[in-house]
Amino acid sequence: MNNIELLDCTIRDGGYVNNWKFTDEQMKKCYNACSIAGLDYMEFGFRNIKKKESIDKYGPSYFSDEEYINNIVGNQESTCKIAVMVTINDFDINDFVPKNQSKISLVRVLMAYHGGKNKDDLVLDIKQLSDGIVQMNQLIELGYDVAFNIGRIDKVSFEQISEVAKLLSQTKIKYFVMADTYGSVDNDYIEKLIPFVKREFSNSQIKIGFHAHDNCTNATTKALHALKYGADIVDGCVLGFGRGSGNAKTELLMMDLNKNYNKNYNFINIIEFGDEYLINYKECTNNLCYNVVYALAAYVGCHVTYAIDIIEIYDKMKVSDIYNIFMELKRLNKHMFHYSSLFKELYVKLKHN
């Protein structure tokens, strides 16, 4: 179970929110947070063809060229590998240098509509897929690991999945990733889908992945359920920050994987990045809005009133300080009930350090 991997796609998926106009500082902070956290991959963005109309409209992580990535990463050494995404048959293989000249490890090739240009769910566009495999093989020859990401997985029949598996099993791609594009996949379907896909790819070394959307506020649960039923890698975004309803929350995935899969992710830096650059916990003051302070309280096992006080009464605190106070309450065995005077004492002590 310790072979499970986690990919953070905050920048690539969250780019739909701001047209990929992240500052260099945000990018560097995100990569640093992912590195310290021990994440397996950070997806820097798309690698799209540079067209004038696109350059005018979108920020640099829409293109994620070599110069841009090199500028963000610099000489930083990290076990967190870099990924980019391309759209099947809609990218230029010449935009990729050999892997030994690039900081990119993984290229994810997206086929959003299995029916091709007609977008007909009853049809599997074999030509689109076959042409895409040619380019995937070219990427592999350049030295990259390759993931094939298929969208709208609930619209792809099991028979079509079998056809896709037969073609992809003949390649050396590393991952087959399914996207819950409309957020409509539920856990019952996951229990059927993941084992079926595992069987279809059983004669290959290809790992299975799942990308969940949060339309029904259950993306994190679905991602974890996919892991329970055999997925090898799942995607997440910091605080769920992504297109539309968002995605599975990277920090919650990390917490669960630490508890149940013997992982040792450092999620504090991830949360601090989100708190500083996406939305801080003081802006989420009612229970209709996800607030990560409650997640931290749950992870440690602290009484909810401590979290409420932090959000509603006390001045803004660093996420690491919140976590340390929770851990100190637990050490003192005062975490399960609300001791307001003790909490105030710990808070004042923290402020004066």
Model-derived features with residue positions:
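Catalytic cores and adjacent flexible loops of soluble metabolic enzymes
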Residues: 1-353
